[in-house]
């Protein structure tokens, strides 16, 4: 996989949405692919921002979408690192965790289809797809088996949900 250009980004995007384990493993071990991974998060944030703009109007939708995409990536990466590296002792650097989790955001681009067509099942399918991509990314990031990746994914998800719940309750 080349490190720059639209062809490389498209190849990375296609590998990510196909849940190609080799694509996720490759970016985990290649710091030079960081820019492409950031581009995937940026695009997913723009897609989220477009959906927010359709719901709230133009005031800040893209900015909020991009900010939330990068904040989510940061939080998820930190949680996977804490659980996988610190707690379970899997030898992995932080960058090797961030990059696969970044491309796991690729299916979020399809939320635009759900927003444009107002078809709720699309959003549900994309949500399941994102969870599956996250699982593949965790497995590549920690170089672990399916059960460990599932455990780390579920633990990360539980912590994130509880944080969102406590942040939004009043």
Language model feature labels by segment:
Residues 81-165:
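Hydrophobic alpha-helical transmembrane segments and adjacent short intramembrane/lumenal linkers
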Residues 2-95:
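Selected alpha-helical membrane-embedding segments in polytopic membrane proteins
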Residues 37-38, 107, 162, 170:
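Alpha-helix boundary/interfacial micro-motifs
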Residues 47-60, 109-118, 165-169:
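Transmembrane helix-loop junctions in multi-pass membrane proteins
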